[in-house]
Amino acid sequence: MALARAEGNRHIHAMNNPRIDASRITIRRGEAADAAAIAVFGERTFLETFGPANDPAHIRAYLDDAFGLAQQSAELADPDTTILLATFDDMLVAYAQLRRGPLPECVAHADAIELQRFYLDRHAHGSGLASTLMDEVRATAAALGAAHIWLGVWENNPRAIAFYAKCGYDDVGSKTFDVGTDRQVDRVMVAPVAAADPSGRIR
């Protein structure tokens, strides 16, 4: 059912709104018919999160390249890419994207898969959806044969860095990320696919 958002993309968390009920969220694999909804959602959430801190020309260049309909269609068709869509009353409210590809030098695990995107609607923060979606990311990564997950997160996004640390991701180094022609620095974080319980034991 169609929905009414290249190399590693940044991860987004949005503002609190109690209207999203995580118990009514459905998570499924993305399909070809979802390309337009993902393109619109991805551009909007990226712009809301990173637009205020970046030059508009750089942001526009990045959005045109990363979130065009053709690009989303290609990513949905890519056998190395798996997209998870979270819907609430048939509306797209979050999505995650896993991809097999080259690893940064600081990632020591050959079995790692990249969490390329992890985007939430600004009305979903505080609903518990981020944790639910991360659990599904781990399960999907395991089903794809990965034992570790890695991601890149902007060094100037402490809120997202804190979220990933809470989810068990460790900072292992850095890599560059181009927003238009503006070369920026991302922290690289890695976690085992198996989640840790509050005591720190892997389960």
PLM segments and residue spans:
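Short hydrophobic/aromatic beta-strand or adjacent loop that forms the aromatic wall/cage
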Residues: 81, 184-188
